[in-house]
């Protein structure tokens, strides 16, 4: 009788339209209940029974109901699931499989089965890639997934690497493509510079040497520098299968312990590598520098043959320069010694030029994991940037500035690294934060390159980096662009890299553009899709490096958990839940929960906006503070380190 009743249908529609609904993101907790976060200020409680229908991170539309004195959210429609493709660990019970996603807030096992194409016989503890197939808000009774790829077994010591690469959908191996053995006929004249004592300076273990340097005294304090860069585009044809593979990978992926090259190792580590006493084709740049480090306008790009006369290591060169030539290591002849002395002079002049006309990053050490046969962490070495590192850095930055200028002036395009500092709105916010701390900044001025440079110099002169950390969050991210633009972070009008073509596809593209200029040929602008792809790949590679690092740091610091061993740590972030710190001696990041900071929660304010922790109205900690901590706990399942401040 009520079937197809238009009045009833109307009433249902009216009730549905009048029921309050909100859209937000589900935030799970370890206690079964959750919250629907609508924005930074507003969230609704989700009771445990309703949480069974959703997963942490799902974007949903929910009905708001009143339950006693509070409003609760009942998820109704799935807008965007948190999980689509994911990695996790397989569980097996009575031959039935389930998978627990590898995520700190996803603890529930999801029923699953292998996809038909996957032939592996899954066992408990195996790592796998899975894809979600069913979701309760899509009309299904339960969550359900299919296993699409076996990663590795529970016992594999190299699981941190394989799991991370699978999570980010990155390659495990070097490209499996036929390696070209002979050079292309590029109709390119090459100068023979094999008699000049070029040198490479790298880590002792480096095999893919892609830059060599030669410098001579030009009189009156001036120097002439030739930067010679390995030439993979002399072997890799545009549009070839190998070119497509390199474009897809975009970068060599450097992870703790090993790298996954962009090009086949035979090319990157041998045929193109600027090995000592081997004749190699290069793309080169000739630059004249005044005594104060200013480059002349007669920059010349050209193709050449060179022969590296020495493979030098950063630490050897630094030791020799820092001890005035009395270190255990000595250059093999006077020609090499003279090159090192002249390169040191060039480095000091260029460093002063950049201090005055651009911006120089503050030195932070790199941390290198010393690994055993089974992937165990034997030690973590802090590698500080020394004079030899700075010689190479200054030479490469100079060469990249020259390429950026030539590409801009001759073509109007290339692969550029662009960083635009503050946009208008963020400049206003940054200026307001600075004003609160007694620093006057004009929002319009700091949105310009010159104004940004002046602000950075002013902040760098302050006794702490606190203010710098406060305004950094208002800055835009660096991006890859085919159009020339400024790089505020470096304080430069334009910056285009070409000095690492073995490791970066964008540098290969710039090589081809520079060669076209040398030959007087026309060039097509690189596709914008390429710059987007490169930016995404760079993000994935950095996340993979961070994830493997988190795993290895957790392994390494397990032995310190619960002990009295003290670590000096820098406060790097404050959130409602506590503080994040970075251990100074090894670079590990640890979390200090709020209850470890102060027992009485109501007496404490943890403010992300202010970058500080206040206790009873007084600032107790703030970002950039150095404090002492002990390791309270290491949670291997989430690769997280929990620290406690030393009272």
Swiss-Prot record:
Pfam families (UniProt xref): OB_RNB, RNB, S1
GO terms, biological process: mRNA catabolic process
Top-level taxonomic group: Bacteria
Catalyzed reaction equations: Exonucleolytic cleavage in the 3'- to 5'-direction to yield nucleoside 5'-phosphates
The EC number(s) this enzyme carries: 3.1.13.1
GO molecular function: exoribonuclease II activity; RNA binding
Membrane-spanning intervals of the chain: none
Keywords: Cytoplasm, Exonuclease, Hydrolase, Nuclease, RNA-binding
SMART domains: CSP (SM00357), RNB (SM00955)
Family matches, as InterPro entries: CSD, NA-bd_OB-fold, RNase_B_OB_dom, RNase_II, RNase_II/R, RNase_II/R_CS, RNase_II/RNase_R, RNR_Ribonuclease
NCBIfam families tied to this protein: 3_prime_RNase, PRK05054.1, RNase_B
Protein name as annotated: Exoribonuclease 2
Originating species: Erwinia tasmaniensis (strain DSM 17950 / CFBP 7177 / CIP 109463 / NCPPB 4357 / Et1/99)
